[in-house]
Regions:
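Central cavity-lining transmembrane alpha-helices of secondary-active solute carriers
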Residues: 77-92, 141-145, 332-345
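Interfacial helix-cap and linker-helix signal at transmembrane-aqueous boundaries
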Residues: 61-62, 93-94, 126, 178-186, ...
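12-transmembrane solute porter fold
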Residues: 33-50, 54-56, 69-70, 75-76, ...
């Protein structure tokens, strides 16, 4: 096993026979790597797209099926909580049944469930099927990337990393335009049918592009799954608490308190179970490494940075009454540009560019884009974001490509690929950080926007007081203009007061979104400092590819 702290820098042409890390290199290679790559990136993008389309189409789904506001709030939560549950549990499933088998059965079930969801009109059945869809699709994230690291030739690894990262990010920004087109030209049911159509393509690519791996070897006694159940259920309940916290008013709600307390109790149970009966499919000590911890923090920060395009920009336009198709172009530019940048990032990595520097460049670009967006006013339209969104696209693409590339290097050179339990533990850990950390960021940003809007409304309201000559003059002028289409002077004055209140609220939101952009910029500045603490990988992607080729040549000569 190789540790990140004990490997010395390699020579430009590393020797295959001298390197002790050769045993971690994948040797069961795909004979159709292009199909394997497509299958991996589809697995990442399908889940992201499905969750985003569900959130965007929630209002239409509730209106068409007849669900109330409170019931509808739990619909996307059912899908996302199930994703959170299956993340840690995928370690058990992948280690016990085999990665390829779990992926195929999960993909088949997800396809069937997605096709049936549009036909469901019963609330309990809808929530149950969405939970099942989350459970089945939640295996795509950790297992597809683990599968790729074990089977894709390393000369394609830079491209796989770039496309995998870009597909996750691009699906988020493509979703508003896709949903807007489907709703206006087709029907809202396509939020379920699109994932159902894409998943069989992923299954075919994995079947023909990646060879079957042998069933993982286990000890004589079967592994226990209770620890996984406790851990997964604990994180899932905490996820649900954070997801509903703002709507339920946090600790003032008994539901939130019960979810949070139950989640913490189950996490404590999983810890006790781990101490009393460790599971050989989980290698927690392997995660106690400097770069692993820092990269987990970086992944959490990146998920928070994404909220600039997931929450702040859409909400800054939706307060004007714009729907998904109308504000979609403001983030669509980012998604289109990222597809081109994926190949640029792959070229840079394949030429030996430092993944840490690529990640730092990306976060710096996002920070500058947020500072440009901090000039936001209530008069902005989607076109005003086009300039900054190009820079945002560069930043988000390079940041996620550098981050995923650093994760791959850390897994390879810390012994993560030398044992199945380490690879699965590594993938499940970062999958959990990505989902749970992302929800922590969403909950914080939602609470931040709500509180800052109240603050700015109160501060602006201090200057709009009854009896002030400025306020009274504005009321009189507006009432005079509205009197012709009002039933009387009192009605016209009431409508004028509503217009002033709406303008006040719009300005309060404008100041809130400016604060949000500044917050994201400061988060980028913090992650830039963190990247300076990351230790350099022993080899870059160009040297890794050369190492594998020499290793395979040596094996062939020996045979």
């Amino acid at each position: 096993m190789m540790s990140a702290t004990s490997i010395t820098a390699p020579t430009p042409r590393p020797s295959a026979s001298a390197s002790p890390g050769l045993t971690a290199l994948p040797v069961d290679l795909s004979h159709s790597p292009v199909l394997g790559i497509i299958g991996v990136i589809l697995g990442a993008g399908i889940v992201t797209l499905a969750g985003r389309l569900l959130s965007l189409g929630l209002a239409d789904l509730k209106g068409s099926v007849g669900f109330g506001a409170d019931d509808g709030a739990w619909i996307p939560s059912a899908f996302n909580v199930a994703l959170m549950f299956i993340g840690p549990f995928s370690v058990y499933l992948g280690g016990l049944l085999g990665i390829r088998k779990v992926l195929f059965y999960s993909a088949a079930a997800f396809t069937l469930i997605s096709a049936l969801l549009s036909l469901v009109h019963n609330y309990a059945l809808m929530v149950g099927l969405l939970a099942a869809a989350g459970l089945t699709s939640g295996t795509f994230y950790p297992l597809t990337l683990t599968f790729a690291l074990k089977n894709i030739p390393l000369r394609y690894l830079a491209l796989v990393v770039s496309l995998y990262a870009t597909c996750i990010e691009g699906a988020v920004n493509f979703a508003p335009s896709i949903y807007g087109f489907c709703r206006n030209n087709l029907s809202w049911q396509w939020i379920f049918w699109i994932p159902a159509l894409l998943t069989p393509v992923m299954m075919a690519c994995i079947y023909f592009g990646i060879p079957e791996t042998p069933k993982p070897q286990t000890k004589k006694q079967p592994p226990s799954f209770m620890g996984f159940v406790f851990l997964s259920a604990g994180f899932a309940l905490l996820y649900a608490a954070l997801d509903q916290g703002q709507r339920l008013d946090w600790w003032r709600s008994g539901t939130f308190t019960a979810l949070f307390a139950s989640g913490m109790f189950l996490l404590l149970c999983s810890l006790v179970r781990r101490l009393r009966s460790p599971n050989f499919l989980v290698d927690l000590p392997y995660l106690r490494q400097w770069n692993t911890i820092l990269l987990a923090v970086a992944l959490f920060a990146y998920r928070f940075v994404l909220l600039a395009t997931i929450i702040i920009i859409p909400q800054s336009l939706s307060v004007h009454g714009l729907d998904a198709q109308q504000y979609g172009p403001s983030v669509l530019w980012t998604a289109i540009f990222e597809l081109f940048l994926a190949f640029v990032g792959a070229l840079l990595l394949s030429k030996g560019f430092d993944a840490r520097l690529l990640m730092a460049t990306g976060f710096a670009a996002v920070a500058f884009a947020c500072l440009i967006n901090a000039n936001f006013t209530s008069a902005w339209a989607p076109e005003n974001y086009f300039r900054s969104e190009l820079l945002m696209g560069v930043g988000q693409s390079f940041a996620i490509m550098g981050l995923v590339a650093s994760l791959v290097q850390q897994a390879a050179f810390s012994g993560g690929l030398s044992a199945p339990q380490r690879a699965l533990t590594f993938a499940a850990f970062f999958h959990t950080v990505r989902l749970f950390g992302g929800q922590v960021g969403v909950a914080f940003m939602g609470h931040f926007i709500a509180d800052r809007e109240k603050l700015h409304s109160n501060l602006l309201g201090l200057h709009v007081q009854a009896g002030s000559w400025v306020t009274d003059e504005n009321l009189r002028q507006l009432a005079a203009g509205l009197s012709a289409k009002s039933s009387g002077l009192m009605a016209a004055t009431g409508r004028a007061a509503e217009i002033i209140a709406s303008k006040l609220r719009l300005q309060a939101y404008s100041l809130t979104f400016i604060d949000g952009f500044h917050l994201v910029a400061w988060a980028c500045a913090g992650i830039l400092l963190l990247t300076t603490l990351l230790r350099k990988a022993p080899m870059n992607f160009a040297q890794i590819s050369l190492l594998q080729q020499e290793f395979i040549s040596t094996k062939r000569k020996q045979s």
